[in-house]
Amino acid sequence: MADSSTSELACVYSALILHDDAITAEKMNKIISAANVNVEPYWPGLFALEGKNIGDLICNVGSSGPAAGAPAAGAAGGAVEEKKEEKKAESEDESDDDMGLFD
């Protein structure tokens, strides 16, 4: 594993360990040094989530962003009806089950 990946994982794990307590760069440095992992000094500062609720961050990982512009309700309803009419017309044409292969 690359050094940057190891450093990043060490910071992430230390932040998760500190989940119930305030996550600060100082506390993360203590945990990382106790684990005998060498990390560049800027990593804990980047991952210090002071003022953020990590529980909310964990819960929102799978949630998506806002939906793209949705069509107006009236326009969407008309499109659905047109599709149904097209399907009915196609099914009537195919009612002979293609027995007259090339009519």
Curated annotation (Swiss-Prot):
Keywords annotated in UniProt:
Ribonucleoprotein, Ribosomal protein
Domain of life of the organism encoding this protein: Eukaryota
Query: Keyword Ribosomal protein, does the record have it?
Result: yes
* Gene3D superfamilies documented for this protein: 1.10.10.1410
Q: Name one GO cellular component term.
A: cytosolic large ribosomal subunit
Q: Where is this region: Disordered?
A: 66-103
From start to end residue, where is composition biased (Basic and acidic residues)? Answer: 80-90
Span-the-membrane segments of this chain are none
Q: What GO molecular functions are on record for this protein? A: protein kinase activator activity; ribonucleoprotein complex binding; structural constituent of ribosome
Q: Is Transmembrane one of the keywords UniProt gives this record?
A: no
Where are stretches of biased composition, namely Acidic residues?
91-103
GO annotation, biological process: cytoplasmic translation; translational elongation
InterPro entries xrefs: P1/P2_N_sf, Ribosomal_P1/P2
Provide the assembly information: P1 and P2 exist as dimers at the large ribosomal subunit.
Q: Can you tell me which family this protein belongs to?
A: Belongs to the eukaryotic ribosomal protein P1/P2 family.
Q: What does this protein do?
A: Plays an important role in the elongation step of protein synthesis.
The protein in question is named: Large ribosomal subunit protein P1
Supply the source organism for this entry: Polyorchis penicillatus
